[in-house]
Amino acid sequence: MARIAGVDIPRDKRVVISLTYVFGIGRTTAQQVLKEAGVSEDTRVRDLTEDELGKIRDIIDKLKVEGDLRREVSLNIKRLIEIGSYRGIRHRRGLPVRGQNTKNNARTRKGPRRTVANKKK
C-alpha cells in the first residue's frame, strides 16, 4: 500500500479511485491532481513508479486534506456556535442546519426516536 497524506491507499484499485480514500479528495480533485502530475487515471496504484508517486504527493501536500481540513471544519462549526448564529444553534441542538423539514424526517441528524409517554387523564 502506498501512503499519501498519511493514508494507506489500496494498491489494486485505479489511482483516481484510490485517491478518494484521502479525506478532502473526491473524484474531481483526484482527476485534477492526476492531470497535473501527468499520470493516467486508468493506472493501478501498484503500477505507479516512485517518481509518479512523488509528484502526486507533492501536489496533494499543497491541498488542505485530512487533519488540517477536519480541524478547519470543526473550528468553523465551533465559531458558528460561539457567535450564536442560527446555524450555530442548529448545530448545538443536533438538528438539520440547512433548512430541512424536521416534523417527519431528519432521523439521521436527530438520532434514534425517544418516545414520550402520554400524561394520564
Curated annotation (Swiss-Prot):
Compositional bias ranges of the Basic residues kind: 106-121
CC per GO annotation: cytosol; small ribosomal subunit
GO molecular function: rRNA binding; structural constituent of ribosome; tRNA binding
Biological process per Gene Ontology, one example term: translation
PROSITE patterns: RIBOSOMAL_S13_1, RIBOSOMAL_S13_2
Superkingdom assignment: Bacteria
Gene3D superfamilies: 1.10.8.50, 30s ribosomal protein s13, domain 2
Region annotated Disordered, chain positions: 93-121
Keyword line: Ribonucleoprotein, Ribosomal protein, RNA-binding, rRNA-binding, tRNA-binding
Complex and partners: Part of the 30S ribosomal subunit. Forms a loose heterodimer with protein S19. Forms two bridges to the 50S subunit in the 70S ribosome.
PANTHER family per UniProt: 30S RIBOSOMAL PROTEIN S13/40S RIBOSOMAL PROTEIN S18, SMALL RIBOSOMAL SUBUNIT PROTEIN US13M
Family: Belongs to the universal ribosomal protein uS13 family.
Described purpose of this protein according to its UniProt entry: Located at the top of the head of the 30S subunit, it contacts several helices of the 16S rRNA. In the 70S ribosome it contacts the 23S rRNA (bridge B1a) and protein L5 of the 50S subunit (bridge B1b), connecting the 2 subunits; these bridges are implicated in subunit movement. Contacts the tRNAs in the A and P-sites.
HAMAP family from the UniProt entry: Ribosomal_uS13 (MF_01315)
NCBIfam families: uS13_bact (TIGR03631)
Protein's UniProt name: Small ribosomal subunit protein uS13
Species lineage: Bacteria, Bacillati, Bacillota, Bacilli, Bacillales
